[in-house]
């Protein structure tokens, strides 16, 4: 099995829809670090699991300089964003979404 990971920094904004009062319910932004983990039993015709630039382009296109609430139909928590990103990237099995130094969410396919 081959494994690769790609780390991408994105500047994004969102607001959370919560059942309790929180600063996160208001529009705010993050300089998030997204780490995408991909795997494959075989390499493609170029000798890769996936091209790192493809992963970067996908993640940047989804999130960078975006108001994420306009792009998704779910509550854009770090956990949900990690799952959403994982679903978009070829051969992805795990995503870590770090919205700040201390707040990190991970989604991993079973």
What are these regions (language model features)?
Residues 1-110:
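Charge-rich, low-complexity N-terminal segments
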């Amino acid at each position: 099995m081959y494994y690769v990971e790609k780390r991408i920094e994105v500047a994004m904004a969102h607001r959370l829809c919560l059942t309790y009062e929180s600063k996160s319910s208001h529009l705010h932004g993050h300089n998030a670090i997204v780490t995408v983990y991909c795997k494959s039993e075989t390499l493609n015709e170029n000798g890769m699991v996936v091209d790192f630039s493809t992963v970067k382009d996908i993640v940047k296109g989804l999130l960078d300089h975006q108001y994420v609430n306009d792009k998704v139909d779910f509550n854009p928590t770090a956990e949900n964003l990690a799952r959403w990103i994982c679903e978009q990237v070829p051969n992805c099995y795990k995503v870590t979404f770090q919205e700040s130094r201390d707040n990190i969410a991970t989604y991993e396919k079973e």
